[in-house]
Amino acid sequence: MSIIRSERYSAIFLLCSAALAIIFANVLDPDTWHAVHSAVSEYHIFGLITPHDIVADFLLAVFFFAVAIELKHELVKGELSSFSKAIIPGVCAAGGILVPISIYLSVASVLPNGWPVPTATDVAFSLGILAIFGSSLPSKVRIFLLALAVLDDLAGIVIIATAFSVSISYWWIIVACITVGLFGFCSYRLARCKTSKTFLIIPAMLLCALAAWVSVYQSGIHATIAGVMLGIMLNRKQGAAIEHALEPYINGIILPAFAFLAAMVRVPHLPLDEISPALWGILLGLLFGKLLGISVFGIIALKFFRKKSISFFNLLVVSALGGIGFTVSLLMNELAFLGTPVHEQGVIAVLIGSLLSAILAIILMRCYKGRKSKSLPGRKGRVSH
């Protein structure tokens, strides 16, 4: 379990899953590929839900449940618990969202639905790359990246809830709010009840959580938002233990499974003039939009608020890592383009943009290590996860 909990191995699992998916999709003949794709996305288990929806809607809701727990912790007692702590990561996160959107819309204005795709940062992948290659960097770089990624996730949650919600059913939303409220009440009672009564409360919480997910799924809002609502309502005392318990399943099963399904596309053989502008918009948004947005907004914020929370070089490293959209960007791409010819090109753009951003970050971290090679040994405060 300790290996699966490791940020290093989490990034490796994700990368291997995406690579295997692309290889699998492109070695099959077209007829077999079409049959596999139809089975995953069109076959309804018991006439209720497709295998794709189980992963993209149900299992990813568990991931966003853990994200919400971490977000709540950071807002209450962590790196975002005060204005002075949150302002620099907040400004950087804003730049890392606004600039990629601007680049995307300037390149692909004919396909405006894809503007959210380059705004995401994959917290698991980016922290994994930092853990593998950034051992010589100060530990505050990881803290800054985590705060930035948490705010980025918050923005992603808002985008998913607003930009990708269709045919809203307010009746189901009311049911979802009631069940989430009951979940929060049960969580509150669980934190204060005697051990002998937990066998009644825990099943009630699970039933409320399942009912909340079904309600959100039926409401027209993306079902992952159910995970966010439940994570926010969970009692903070239980949050850390539950997040720790879920971590190996999220890192070892949920995220790799989604990465495999989302990246399972056939690489189209298109001439340069037939490539969709959405591909260029997503690719440039992730690679250059994140780099420029986070670094430039960060420099302005550091100067304006006269803070020294992170050096310019380390800010560049974080900016490059911010361009690793991967899992969340793949989800955004599905929501924006699934069922259209642009979808496959969007997946390729996310994968290439994330890979190039990771390579750029690795080069910067290697440069930092080279600059520090003459430093005295035994210095503390390094990234070591």
Swiss-Prot record:
Pfam families: Na_H_antiport_1. GO terms for biological process: regulation of pH. Na(+)/H(+) antiporter that extrudes sodium in exchange for external protons. The chain crosses the membrane at residues 9-29, 45-65, 87-107, 114-134, 155-175, 198-218, 220-235, 245-265, 282-302, 312-332, 345-365. One of its GO terms (cellular component) is plasma membrane. GO terms for molecular function: sodium:proton antiporter activity. Gene3D superfamilies: Na+/H+ antiporter like domain. It is found in: Cell membrane. The keyword Membrane applies. Its main location: membrane. This is Na(+)/H(+) antiporter NhaA.
